Design a protein with these regions (language model features):
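Short linear motifs embedded in intrinsically disordered, proline/glycine-rich low-complexity segments
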Residues: 51-60, 66-79, 84-100, 114, ...
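Short, low-complexity Pro/Thr/Gly
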Residues: 176-382, 387-390
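Extracellular ectodomain segments of secreted/surface proteins
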Residues: 41, 53-60, 78, 153-164, ...
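C-terminal domain/tail detector
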Residues: 28, 360-613
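Mixed-charge (acidic/basic) macromolecular-recognition segments
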Residues: 1-24, 29, 36, 228-277, ...
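Extended assembly-interface regions of large multimeric machines
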Residues: 1-220
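Generic structural motif
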Residues: 148-158, 227-232, 286, 463, ...
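Generic hydrophobic, helix-prone segments enriched in Leu/Val/Ile
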Residues: 48-49, 70-72, 153, 202-210, ...
Length: 613
């Protein structure tokens, strides 16, 4: 039952029970109040009064969203935004046409096929609404850069011995390819194996156990002692969601880990020596050496490592229906599309502009556009208290009563929250630039449905989605969760001293767990596996200078996890998140101990991101 519907049901039940008591005292009213099938007009009046009193009760118990929403929008706006559907896009280069590496940049727009008969196949008599929704193409934006090269992976094989681990990755290139046409530093692997155990174990071995590598082509051997694998997803250029500059990346990493952990199974090859001119590139093997054998039960296949893959997210720019403010309303409905309301949802309001009516011909075209400032920003102008002149726009949201998600509106206010008069608008027509999603439609797509380019697409490659888009997630509207989030953002050293406090902070960021009971149960089991937490100050030398930082040790029970690799991935995410708790010019280092095997992993020191002022 929806949060708002609960109040209505409780108030209606209270009125009906009260009606039965009143009918006992006044029997002549029993026909109207006590009987279930009584007077329909009285029933409608009771339902209307229950709706009004339920709305009033909800307002009294809503935990002051006027305060929490404004504060969260300035500190971490993505918590109040929906998490769109996400998927992985794989490109298939035409190796005979590629002469040099071709880059496909992030923010490239792609879409699904417009005609989707499978969307209405389950209904015997689909109505016109279903036909409209099925004809809307879902637009996705590439989240990361990708380089296309005339290379393919033929096979991935576990060649481990009793002393060391070995993985052989066999490549093939076009017969006309030369070493000058290839750049191995631009290779990105995606651990696309459907076996979660294998991909998590590979993640652990790639990050912790890699010693060196070599290229093998027949009798030709080229040592690569400096090669290493960089885990993707932690740098700001790897962000899936649009991220405000004033928000620390640790929040982003934690949110993306809970909402789409698939984005962290990408690795970049780094520090690979250039290929010699006489190296045979038509068929060669990259051999990775590890300091211990790989587990015997991992299953390596041809698709265990995939090339030319990148995450994509269901976000795109769109313009809202025009708004003409007149100063008579406190807020105005903000709709992405009046024609297709169930096909578009607002993720973010980017800019608000209007055309200024200028008399004469001396003004330049650029001066005819008015850019309205945002109310929840750090760009308020200095004004005298009784001479408010600047008008700001304010994006407001509330839970929708008619569909999943939020209802959006836009208000125009002065800095003190007062509503400006009609003379401030001059009959302006407001144009609102949005970043939108396609609501629930992407969740109905299947593998291979996203395969159409919108703008420019390399003529030397085709693409398609190789994973089914995830289910969109709506923001949590519970006021208690908002206050918990604000408390979690109050970064201090004490948060790393108590186990229960840390677990509560992590649960606050678990948006899938707030929507799916099964995901919440699994997440709770994994967080409860943190048996002990210890944080203490430490001193280490950096370039000969002693620097004081924080060292945190976690003791984790491995039972709820798939394998040790899943624990290691969680630790990698936490090492970036804990850097928020160390001040600038300081650092934080994390250590995790497996309580069963007593194996320990320690991450490199992360420089502090918590400003002192």
């Amino acid at each position: 039952m929806a949060f708002e519907e609960r109040y209505y049901r409780e108030e209606l039940d209270y009125l009906r029970q009260l009606g039965k008591l009143l009918a006992q005292e006044k029997p002549h009213l029993a026909h109207f109040l006590a009987e279930k099938e009584g007077d329909p007009d009285v029933e409608r009046l009771m339902e209307a009064f229950a709706f009004m009193s339920g709305s009033l009760r909800q307002k009294l118990e809503d935990e002051f969203p006027e305060f929490t929403h404004g504060l969260i929008r300035m500190l971490w706006a993505n918590y109040l935004r929906p998490v769109p559907a996400m998927t992985v896009i794989a490109y298939e280069p035409k190796t005979d046409q590629l002469k040099v590496p071709v880059q496909v940049c992030r923010n490239e727009l792609i879409r699904s096929r417009s005609e989707k008969s499978s969307l209405t196949a389950q209904k015997v008599l689909p109505d016109n609404h279903d036909k409209i929704v099925s004809s809307v193409a879902c637009h996705f934006t590439l989240a990361r850069d990708i380089w296309l090269q005339p290379l393919r992976i033929l096979d991935t094989r576990n060649a481990s011995s009793l002393k060391e681990g070995i993985i052989d990755i066999s490549f093939t290139a076009d017969n006309n390819a030369s070493p000058a046409m290839l750049d191995l530093n631009k290779i990105t692997f995606w651990l696309g194996n459907e076996d979660d155990y294998t991909r998590h174990q590979l993640y652990l071995w790639f990050c912790e156990c890699l010693m060196d590598a070599e290229l093998i082509a027949g009798e030709y051997r080229l040592p690569l002692p400096d090669l290493w694998l960089e885990a993707a997803g932690f740098d700001n250029r790897d962000a899936l969601l649009p991220w405000p500059k004033n928000v620390h990346s640790g929040y982003r990493v934690l949110q993306e880990y809970f909402c789409y952990p698939e984005a962290f199974f990408f690795f970049h090859l780094r520090d690979v020596a250039p290929l010699p001119d006489d190296f045979p590139v038509s068929a060669f093997t990259l051999r990775l050496h590890f300091n211990r054998p790989l587990p015997a039960d991992i299953k390596l296949r041809q698709d265990s490592l995939r090339l030319h893959c990148t995450p994509a997210i269901n976000l795109f720019t769109h313009y809202a229906d025009p708004v003409r403010p007149d100063g008579r309303m406190a807020e105005y409905p903000l709709r992405a599309s009046h024609k297709h309301p169930d096909a578009y949802d607002i993720f973010q309001v980017s800019t608000v502009t209007s055309k200024i009516k200028v008399s004469g011909t001396d003004s330049s075209p650029g001066s005819q556009v008015r850019v309205w400032p945002e109310f929840e920003s750090f760009q308020h102008q200095m004004e005298y208290s009784r001479q408010r002149e600047v008008v700001y726009w304010h994006h407001r949201t509330k839970t929708s009563l008619f569909h999943y998600g939020l209802e959006h509106s836009i208000a125009f206010v002065h800095a003190d929250g007062s509503i400006p008069g009609s003379s401030r608008f001059n009959d302006d027509v407001i144009t609102t630039s949005l970043i939108c999603t396609n609501r629930m439609i992407p969740a109905r797509l299947h593998t291979g449905d996203i395969c159409v380019a919108v703008n420019k697409n390399p003529a030397v490659a085709s693409f398609r989605n190789v994973t089914r888009p995830t289910q969109p997630l709506w923001p949590v509207t519970d006021g208690d969760m908002h206050w918990s989030l604000i408390s979690a953002m109050n970064l201090n050293y004490l948060s790393l001293l108590d186990r229960e406090t840390l677990i509560q902070i992590l649960r606050t960021f678990d948006l899938p767990g707030a929507h799916h009971p099964q995901r919440a149960r699994l997440s709770r089991q994994k967080l409860d596996a943190i048996e002990k937490l210890e944080t203490k100050p430490v001193d280490r030398l950096f370039k000969g200078v002693p620097v004081r930082g924080l060292a945190t040790t976690l003791w984790i029970r491995p039972d709820p996890f798939i394998c040790e690799g899943e624990i290691y991935l969680l630790g990698t995410v936490l090492s970036h998140f804990f850097a928020l708790y160390a001040s600038i010019n300081s650092y934080h280092c994390l250590k995790i101990i497996n309580t069963e095997s007593q194996e320990a992993w320690e991450w490199q020191e992360k420089m502090g991101q918590h400003a002192l002022i």
